[in-house]
């Protein structure tokens, strides 16, 4: 099979059209015929081996029928601010970096999960290359993190170090071996290893996941008490025959 394929449309208008209020009947029209493609087990043996060996969440859907950053906001904060009271509603990728690196100048101002973890005394860190994270770290859109990144007076420098700093997989392994792995860690892959169609491929994504597993299993005692979630923020636009569950319409 062709490993490196181009992505399909996966933004708010085309995703809403493909979903079609749950009918799921307009996928090729909204996202091109390419959206009906798929891989067999022989094409992606590493991913199938993981699925066979570990728990597979086979009812795993996007939180919102749109693109990357909105769904990452749901994962990292629990909302996209649908009422628009704190910089939302977020339906696109406008806030996927700090303003000095091209992000939208307006801040998101609601509270993220990592801030709640910190206030509860739970340790956390983001492992990433801030210069090459495929703009997939949603913390870069939030006022408190942007202020810390810019070194603003009164900002909390810990938010920059833990949330918007650079600590890659070698740092993850070092932390495992030194016994200082946080209680909660987020790992953001570089573009080439993100498994995202276009810049990456299933083979490259498999290699990155294998490196994460190698780091976590470097200390068997750490691995024994670790839960690893391998997560995708959305479907890129490739077809899923199962309609996602939705809340009742307010209308």
Where are the language model's segments positioned?
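N-terminal pro-sequences and low-complexity stem/linker regions of secreted or lumenal proteins
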Residues: 1-251
């Amino acid at each position: 099979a062709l490993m490196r394929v181009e992505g399909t449309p996966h933004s708010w208008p085309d995703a809403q059209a493909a979903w079609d209020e749950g009918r799921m009947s307009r996928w090729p029209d909204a996202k091109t015929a390419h959206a009906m493609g798929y891989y067999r087990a022989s094409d992606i043996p590493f991913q199938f081996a993981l699925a066979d060996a570990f728990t597979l969440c086979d009812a795993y859907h996007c939180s919102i029928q749109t693109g990357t950053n909105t769904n990452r906001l749901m994962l990292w904060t629990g909302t996209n601010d649908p009422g628009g009271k704190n910089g939302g509603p977020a339906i696109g990728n406008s806030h996927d970096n700090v303003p000095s690196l091209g992000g939208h100048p307006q801040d998101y101002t609601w509270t993220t999960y990592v801030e709640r973890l910190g206030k509860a005394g739970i340790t956390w860190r983001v492992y990433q290359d801030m210069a090459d994270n495929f703009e997939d770290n949603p913390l870069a859109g939030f006022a408190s993190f942007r202020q810390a990144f810019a070194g603003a007076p009164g900002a909390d420098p810990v938010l920059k170090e833990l949330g918007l700093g650079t600590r890659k997989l070698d740092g993850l392994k070092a932390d495992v071996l030194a016994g200082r792995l946080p209680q909660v860690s987020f790992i953001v892959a570089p573009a080439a290893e993100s498994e995202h169609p276009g810049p990456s491929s299933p083979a490259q994504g498999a290699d990155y996941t294998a490196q994460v597993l190698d780091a976590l299993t470097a200390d068997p005692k750490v691995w024994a008490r670790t839960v690893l979630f391998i997560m995708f923020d959305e479907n890129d636009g490739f077809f899923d025959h199962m309609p996602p569950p939705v809340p009742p319409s307010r209308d």
